[in-house]
Curated annotation (Swiss-Prot):
It comes from Streptococcus pyogenes serotype M2 (strain MGAS10270). Gene3D superfamilies: Bira Bifunctional Protein, Domain 2, Serine-tRNA synthetase, tRNA binding domain. Keywords: Aminoacyl-tRNA synthetase, ATP-binding, Cytoplasm, Ligase, Nucleotide-binding, Protein biosynthesis. Pathway: Aminoacyl-tRNA biosynthesis; selenocysteinyl-tRNA(Sec) biosynthesis; L-seryl-tRNA(Sec) from L-serine and tRNA(Sec): step 1/1. The lineage of its organism: Bacteria, Bacillati, Bacillota, Bacilli, Lactobacillales. InterPro entries: aa-tRNA-synt_IIb, aa-tRNA-synth_II, aa-tRNA-synth_II/BPL/LPL, Ser-tRNA-ligase_type_1, Ser-tRNA-synth_1_N, SerRS_1_N_sf, SerRS_core, tRNA-bd_arm. GO terms for molecular function: ATP binding; catalytic activity, acting on a protein; serine-tRNA ligase activity; transferase activity. The keyword rRNA processing does not apply. The gene is serS. This is Serine--tRNA ligase. HAMAP family: Ser_tRNA_synth_type1.
Length: 425
């Protein structure tokens, strides 16, 4: 959530930054007007309360001296009624302010490219060279069926579209991947966490999914619980409402969890395969950092995700998302896109973001600065390290062989009992 004081004192800068994120200046102007009216009413309320205190003292003095206080009582009752009217107005204005400010996206960092959509994203670097196949490549969903490791038909029967069963060496490959990913992140100083897979509405607000993106989630009917869309939500909210010791920062968390997405706006997109599912595993990275260190931590986090792809030998590129393509809470985001041969293109497999103090303000996560003893908002970062199902897809396609088999990347073999290849039955 944005700082209302910043909007008040640096309106033009904030308006210009949010314009690049699709927010009209009229929205901010209305917010500023509401804020000004609210502050005026607060002053009036305080002045009336001071009058009421004086009137109350005068009534008490009159009663002690056994004098009549009819007029003073009438005056105080009028003042009290005026205070109640103003307080009711303040409640209404506070709600209007909340309705606007809670759905405003984060302001982009100055280094973020300005643009409208993914066409304006900027490629930063590439790693690896896509393999030159001398046979016709198969899509991962066909490979999965032919190898008897992915079962889409029974997934649809048991649950519905965009669900599947992993089986045999497919299940082992999925498990090998997330164990490998977790082990690599632990080497880099991340604490492994097993999170709840349901969170409450306050947690969803804290990380920015609520109220704006409710339709993208699965809520449990008649409860305060939501299935997590990403482990970012429980990991970030771990410290919600707390004040951390500045000497402990930065703090690194990692977790593997299922992620549940309704994909409300994705009808007709990626209807086959592992790219877009309602339920998938993802290894998440979350950091809590001091503001002056957070962008250095973003580069490290991105490198941590790249490390996984490099050790798996998967070609990828790093993209800096433009202002129009970034997620709601992000101030800056790098996407890692892995090469998918059957589609002859790169597809997102990780997204690493610095939200600055946007989530920390919503979730009230602060730290005590050891330098001056002041309590301040920290910065939160999050990143995929990696989306496991998409990594399975990338391995199946990039490591496929002409005979229909798939070679298992060397780093995963210890996690798969020494298996070196997945062969057709």
């Amino acid at each position: 959530m944005l700082d209302l004081k910043r909007i008040r004192t640096d309106f033009d800068t904030v308006a210009a930054k949010l314009k690049n994120r699709g927010v009209s200046e009229d929205t901010l102007t209305h917010l500023k007007e509401l804020d000004e009216k609210r502050r005026t009413l607060l002053v009036q309320s305080e002045e009336l309360k001071a009058e009421r205190n004086i009137a109350s003292a005068a009534i008490a003095q009159a009663k002690r001296q056994k004098e009549g206080a009819t007029q003073q009582i009438a005056d105080m009752q009028k003042v009290s009624a005026d205070i109640k009217t103003i307080d009711n107005q303040l409640v209404a204005i506070d709600q209007q302010v909340a309705d606007i400010i809670t759905v405003l996206p984060n302001t982009p960092h100055d280094s973020v490219p300005v643009g409208a959509d993914e066409e304006d994203n900027v490629e930063i670097r590439r790693w690896g060279t896509p393999r030159d196949f001398d046979f016709e490549v198969k899509a991962h969903w066909n490979l999965g069926e032919d190898l008897d490791i992915l079962d889409w038909e029974r997934g649809a029967k048991v649950t519905g579209a965009r669900f599947l069963f992993y089986k045999n060496l497919g299940a082992r490959l999925e498990r090998a991947l997330y164990n490998f990913m977790l082990d690599e992140h632990i080497k880099e100083g991340y604490q492994e966490i097993i999170t709840p897979y349901m969170v409450n509405h306050d947690s969803m607000f804290g990380t920015g999914q609520y109220p704006k993106f409710k339709e993208d989630t699965f809520e449990l009917a008649d409860t305060n619980f939501v299935l997590i869309p990403t482990a970012e939500v429980p990991l970030t909210n771990y410290y919600r409402g707390e004040i951390l010791d500045g000497k402990e920062l930065p703090i690194y968390f990692t977790a593997m969890s299922p992620s549940f997405r309704s994909e409300a706006g994705s009808a007709g997109r990626d209807t086959r395969g592992l790219i877009r599912l309602h339920q998938f595993h993802k290894v998440e990275m979350v950091k809590f950092a001091k503001p002056e260190e957070s962008y250095q931590e973003l580069e490290k986090m991105t490198a941590n995700a790249e490390n996984i792809l490099q050790k798996l030998g998967l070609p990828y590129r790093v993209i800096s998302l433009c202002t129009g393509d970034m997620g709601f809470s992000a101030a800056k985001t790098y996407d890692l896109e892995v090469w998918i041969p059957a589609q002859n293109t790169y597809r997102e497999i990780s997204s690493c973001s610095n939200t600055e103090d946007f989530q920390a303000r919503r979730a009230q996560i602060r730290y005590r600065d050891e330098a001056d003893g002041k309590v301040k908002l920290l910065h939160t970062l999050n990143g995929s390290g990696l989306a496991v199902g998409r990594t399975v897809a990338a391995i199946l396609e990039n490591y496929q062989n002409e005979d229909g088999s798939v070679t298992i990347p060397e780093v995963l073999r210890p996690y798969m009992g020494g298996e070196t290849v997945i062969s057709p039955k």
